């Protein structure tokens, strides 16, 4: 573009770095599930997090790859269009993500188990990522407790809130898996990838926690539209 290779542009470099970090986080989370299963420990919650995160992050990576290819992304010979199509179904197969998030969120609310912290027992290059992880962990614990007190058993009817809590936990879990993997390998590459992955995941998780405060209003506004939406559908014969 403009006589320069795409990789020379900082915007492209940032996108590719984030894609690589997402792949690292996906691999880390799947490895974590496998290791726990090998120890014959329960993988129910962790496997849910891996399924949701990996199916959504992989599709996002493929979508960005199509964008970077430009019009060539739609040409079958490049292979990325097929990756995008095939990647989309994974959010539905083996349990739709929306349903899994409800189950996972309700599990978090009933478990009352504090989220583990990483502290400072990590490589110096991961201190920032570990601090971001621990801030999110404490924020999630506080938000879960506030939700329990505010809604009690009625929280099962607050699906938007429950899903946002679960998404914050998925981000936290993927960030922790990334940091722990990099701490074990201690290679410069893994440390750099884990830092990008964990910082981004924790920022996303914090946004989901912020969104929980707006969940009731979002649900109310959506409910107000239902009459028009379904009336329009009936008029159209649907």
Residues of each region from the PLM?
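Alpha-helical interface subdomain recognition
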Residues: 1-238
């Amino acid at each position: 573009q403009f006589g320069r290779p795409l990789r020379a542009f900082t915007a492209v470099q940032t996108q590719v770095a984030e894609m690589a970090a997402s792949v690292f986080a996906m691999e880390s989370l799947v490895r974590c599930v496998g290791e726990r299963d090998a120890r014959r420990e329960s993988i129910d919650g962790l496997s849910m997090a891996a399924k949701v995160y990996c199916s959504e992050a992989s599709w996002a990576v493929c979508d960005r790859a199509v964008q970077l290819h430009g019009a060539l992304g739609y040409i079958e010979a490049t292979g990325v269009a097929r990756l995008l199509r095939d990647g989309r179904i994974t959010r539905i197969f083996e349990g739709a993500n929306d349903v899994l998030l409800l189950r996972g969120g309700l599990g978090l609310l009933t478990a009352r188990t504090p989220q583990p912290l990483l502290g400072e027992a990590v490589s110096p290059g991961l201190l920032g990522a570990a601090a971001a992880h621990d801030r999110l962990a404490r924020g999630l614990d506080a938000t879960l407790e506030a939700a329990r007190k505010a809604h009690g058993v009625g929280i099962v009817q607050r699906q938007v809130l429950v899903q946002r809590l679960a998404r914050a936990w998925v981000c936290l879990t993927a960030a922790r898996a990334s940091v722990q993997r990099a701490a074990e390998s201690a290679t410069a590459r893994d440390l750099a990838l884990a830092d990008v992955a964990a910082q981004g995941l924790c920022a996303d998780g914090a946004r989901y926690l912020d969104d929980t405060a707006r969940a009731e209003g979002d649900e109310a506004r959506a409910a107000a539209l239902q009459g028009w939406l379904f009336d329009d559908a009936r008029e159209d014969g649907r």
